[in-house]
Amino acid sequence: MKNRLPHLIAMLLACLMLLSSVSILAGCVKEDAPATETASGQNGAAGETSTEYVPDIAKKNYNTTFNVVAIGFNQDLLILDEDKKRDGNSLDEAVYERGVLVKEQLGVECKFADAGDWISYSGKIANTVQIGDDAYQLVLTHVYQGVTDLVTSNSLMNFTDLPSVNLDAPYWNRNLMESLKVDDRYLLGYSDFCLSSTHCVVFNKDMLQNYRLEDPYALVNNKKWTVDKLFSLASAVSEDNGDGKWTVDDYYGISGWGWVPLITFITSCDMKIVDRDEDTGRYYVAYEDNTEKMLSLIDKVTTMYKANYSYMWPSVNYTALKFAEGHSLFQLYSTTGLISLATEKIRFGVLPYPKFDEKQENYRSLNWNGLMGVPASVNKAGNPQMVGEVLELLGYYTGTVKTAYYELQLGAKVSEAQEDADMLDIIWKSLVSDIGLVCCNSSGSMDNLVYMLPMICESPKKNFSSFMRSNKDSAQKGLDKVFKQ
């Protein structure tokens, strides 16, 4: 489609926000705590949350603060002071009210704490743990920067050592946490409070109708939404404006940043960057678990990347095609951008990334959000009971935040756009993590393997075999060092 030169890999600040499903955790009740007032409140209403599960946490007054380090997260979606709350903004109201409910229930005020930037924060956390300083109660990490440092420096405590935490509660993503266990410990957590971030596929409803193409919502619901189907529908749109050049002024079936969003195709097609051996527990580079399938996916994506029906801009020095201007049927899109897209005039729909084929059972979306960690100093010098209870309530009272967030993403009330909201539900419920992405900075070779698919698309001289020869062994050594295996 267009001539492209190889580009140097640019480490991505996945400073994203977003969401997931919602509610929070059950915990232990102290014997001397009032038994009549729990997290459900005196009226039994769970802070207007939609879940039926209610954490059994007694009302008390710790009279303290809960200090949160947030790296790579949109802070306004986590904690919002009253003076920053915009009147009439339902999302601001929900975030603010969540903090009020936690304070009323536990006498704990949630505040942000400074631990440096995304490069230095892990070192500062490790230092507070080493000296036994209970300065921070929660760290929300970058998607991968600093995560392995926190693990290898023994700076995080096991979530199951927090007395109040019940990982079986609906607001914890236990499946994701299981995939990230280290030595059978849950050092990295994930709950609805994190407001997940991933990539999705948006489509132009008017363009779809004008070209009389299949309804993608029906394809998703009927489990027929596959890579081949996406690219087949996209191939129906390829219109040059007459100047003989393929630019943002022409019309395409599919568009997007030809870098980070391409990585999610590996996950959506039910393959992993790094997996764990069920027998030995050893983490290993997993690209060769199904070489034939991987080669097939690479061929499909690179063919799309070069086709005249696609406009995929490169990793750097690019001109992006703005989806809202109506020049693309589909676009690979970050869920963080849906709120701003909903303010545009374009009529759009939202889809999960496609499956590899119809035989694949589930849709899968790669988590591009950071993770939760509780500094080990909490166990040594702090109050694990209080920390666990706060984490419970923060997740539980995210119900109204989720509803407001959905409506901002859709540009309409959920009740008025149920079909679109159902797609968002599918996306959030399909969220998975990959230890390869989390360990991206464990070595330069692991970084290369994480970005393998977009790098192959950008450079015709690169291929799967050469990538594995050049990076597999070194990446494995990095994993072995991180997990001491």
Language model segments and positions:
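Conserved N-terminal structural module of periplasmic/extracytoplasmic solute-binding proteins
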Residues: 2-153, 401, 457-485
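Extracytoplasmic/periplasmic solute-binding protein
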Residues: 69, 133-139, 143, 181-194, ...
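A structural signal for short loop-to-beta-strand junctions that line the ligand-binding cleft
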Residues: 126-130, 134-145, 155-158, 164-209, ...
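Paired acidic/hydrophobic, glycine-rich loop segments that form the ligand-binding mouth/hinge
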Residues: 136-140, 328-333
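Short, solvent-exposed loop/beta-turn-alpha elements that line the ligand-binding surface or hinge
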Residues: 160-171, 219-222, 271-294, 356-364
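Glycine-centered hinge/linker elements that transmit conformational signals in sensory
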Residues: 231-234, 268-314
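Extracytoplasmic/periplasmic substrate-recognition and gating elements
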Residues: 342-412
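C-terminal capping/gating helix-and-loop segments adjacent to ligand/active sites or protein-protein/ligand interfaces
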Residues: 404-410, 421-485
